[in-house]
């Protein structure tokens, strides 16, 4: 009998991508996050689909429709909690996935990396428009503050902001279009993820040592499907613990109040996964400067491969670069904390110092560390 898995046109693609794919024999648990992100995306699309059946994108009924989902729809509370906390899990996996890419030099696969950065931006846009939909206080004011940043663009800014709003302020038209965006963007994310995988399979996976693994490859199934299954078990465990025992711990209490344009919350802040970028935005007193710094904080990932100066790909055997990498990680955690604090001393100065250090580490210190390590590895005799 002919093996259908290897001959059928459609099954053949799946086989080459997930079953008979040659994978390096030494990839660690840090390589689990790609599959975890795929599962997170499927969870978000499925839970979002069921939420969309009951949600109404109208300013008068949006808030009560979310309350109706939680109170009256069968397992609506569970679907909503899985969707809200699934987004947090998605971003946790995303940040770890990007961190792994920086640590092990995966950015040198430039097509895969650049598509990945576009994916990150698309997922961030999806999460932002999704956060607006429950039409609570923080949803409304978050949308107002972030979309208002467009008005900082010279000459066309105000027109652009009003075009996005569909009026002179965030209102019914904004909510309706944000719901449309939130529905379509995940499918664009799926398409980009397929392109991301396509480019990855052109080169094959990187590995912790950073050297060419072609001489030692093993089939993806069963070795890495089993390994990914363990990661999945942990993902589901954490997600279910969050969704069932502490569903609102990562949300904002202000979002339990319906949106009120006449009452501004004392501290406007986005979800936790945007706080690092929000802290960088707030650390610059000038509006346009803040917007540019916010964009630069993410888009800097596109030029990271131009800043690679080391002769070795991975940081596994580069202690100076390793130290700077973990300082960068601590710095991002500090920025996340600062983003959630009020705009007052000492938080202002800490945020400004952390923002400066973020750009200094990536643009100056890490390339210099690479050059220093090259020099130290040269034979001196």
Curated annotation (Swiss-Prot):
Cofactor info, note text: Binds 2 heme b groups non-covalently.
TM stretches of this protein: 33-53, 77-98, 113-133, 178-198, 226-246, 288-308, 320-340, 347-367
Key words, A-Z: Electron transport, Heme, Iron, Membrane, Metal-binding, Mitochondrion, Mitochondrion inner membrane, Respiratory chain, Transmembrane, Transmembrane helix, Transport, Ubiquinone
Cofactor(s), by name: heme b
Subcellular location: Mitochondrion inner membrane
A GO molecular function held by the record: metal ion binding
UniProt: heme b b562 binding residues: 83, 182
Statement: the UniProt record of this protein carries the keyword Transcription regulation: no
Comment field (misc): Heme 1 (or BL or b562) is low-potential and absorbs at about 562 nm, and heme 2 (or BH or b566) is high-potential and absorbs at about 566 nm.
Biological function: Component of the ubiquinol-cytochrome c reductase complex (complex III or cytochrome b-c1 complex) that is part of the mitochondrial respiratory chain. The b-c1 complex mediates electron transfer from ubiquinol to cytochrome c. Contributes to the generation of a proton gradient across the mitochondrial membrane that is then used for ATP synthesis.
Binding partners and assembly: The cytochrome bc1 complex contains 11 subunits: 3 respiratory subunits (MT-CYB, CYC1 and UQCRFS1), 2 core proteins (UQCRC1 and UQCRC2) and 6 low-molecular weight proteins (UQCRH/QCR6, UQCRB/QCR7, UQCRQ/QCR8, UQCR10/QCR9, UQCR11/QCR10 and a cleavage product of UQCRFS1). This cytochrome bc1 complex then forms a dimer.
Similarity annotation: Belongs to the cytochrome b family.
Full protein name: Cytochrome b
Organism: Antechinus flavipes
Gene that encodes it: MT-CYB
